């Protein structure tokens, strides 16, 4: 059985993430979406909320897809899941530099697990969770970048935390 891992913070999960999940699920028998905390980021949603959000969003995608949280080195997590492939999405050259370096480090940690890069769909390339949150904080429309359920959750969380800025 070919198992792949698609790791990310998914804060929030975007249409770009969904595209990579759909396509990644076709490449493996089981795709494990690893929801993690990035210690360099300040999340809008906590781990449990992000895991639940991702589970809801991927429920209709065809294939054996599991969503789990992890808080360890990616390669340790991938090995525990029995993965032979790490799936990563690339939007632009800047992503490639970072991802190339990470793939090299991961290969040093475990050379039995390959990293596979999927290019983002052209229409989804500019989408980034960080930008979605920023746009929402300033009152911009985010419905083009996330599903309706995620849009509602992001707007509600920003209001709940009093993060709204600027005038519209």
UniProtKB/Swiss-Prot annotation:
Keywords: ATP-binding, Coenzyme A biosynthesis, Cytoplasm, Magnesium, Nucleotide-binding, Nucleotidyltransferase, Transferase. Pathway: Cofactor biosynthesis; coenzyme A biosynthesis; CoA from (R)-pantothenate: step 4/5. ATP binds at residues 9-10, 17, 89-91, 99, 124-130. One of its GO terms (molecular function) is pantetheine-phosphate adenylyltransferase activity. It comes from the Bacteria. SUPFAM superfamilies: Nucleotidylyl transferase. Pfam families: CTP_transf_like (PF01467). It is found in: Cytoplasm. Substrate binds at residues 9, 41, 74, 88. CDD domains: PPAT. It catalyses: (R)-4'-phosphopantetheine + ATP + H(+) = 3'-dephospho-CoA + diphosphate. Reversibly transfers an adenylyl group from ATP to 4'-phosphopantetheine, yielding dephospho-CoA (dPCoA) and pyrophosphate. HAMAP family: PPAT_bact (MF_00151). Homohexamer. This is Phosphopantetheine adenylyltransferase. It comes from Sphingopyxis alaskensis (strain DSM 13593 / LMG 18877 / RB2256) (Sphingomonas alaskensis).
